[in-house]
Amino acid sequence: MARLQEIYRDKIAPELVKQFGYTSPMQVPRLTKITLNMGVSEAVADKKIMDNAVADLTKIAGQKPVVTKAKKAIAGFKIREGQAIGCMVTLRGAQMYEFLDRFVTIALPRVRDFRGISGRAFDGRGNYNIGVKEQIIFPEIEYDKVDALRGLNISITTTAKTDEEAKALLTAFRFPFKN
């Protein structure tokens, strides 16, 4: 069992029950999945760029990503229907907790000029999104072997009903919110 999973079961869940007064243990918010998405618009011109992005995301997530394809053609972006435009990976269970642990304790402190993450990026239904500007903050990515700096979007999906509950859950997981 992952370290954060044990902390959730032993400390965070009972703390949230006290804080919000839940009557059933199934009401306690928990993490459902973490989705990592990397949009690679440059892949339209060069196929090797997509291979490098897939390799980077595989190292970060520890799981092979799915290549996402364009649903319809957009002439302004020079995209045809079915063309590879990004990659994504969904983490659940132990892998999700392991990634969250590495992200909060190792990757976030490596961000340049880091002052905490925004507490306003909740979607109104208890899910949180964070954008990472460069993939080199993850220790799995070797700085010398990176062909280009690419950002990625990290979506954290919870069972929380409100943003307040989700923020309490993520704060208990030691998320460094600045406001």
From Swiss-Prot:
A GO cellular component entry from the record: ribonucleoprotein complex
Signal peptide limits: none
InterPro entries reported for this sequence: Ribosomal_uL5, Ribosomal_uL5_bac-type, Ribosomal_uL5_C, Ribosomal_uL5_CS, Ribosomal_uL5_dom_sf, Ribosomal_uL5_N
Family label: Belongs to the universal ribosomal protein uL5 family.
HAMAP family per record: Ribosomal_uL5_B (MF_01333_B)
UniProt subunit comment: Part of the 50S ribosomal subunit; part of the 5S rRNA/L5/L18/L25 subcomplex. Contacts the 5S rRNA and the P site tRNA. Forms a bridge to the 30S subunit in the 70S ribosome.
Protein name, UniProt field: Large ribosomal subunit protein uL5
Gene behind this protein: rplE
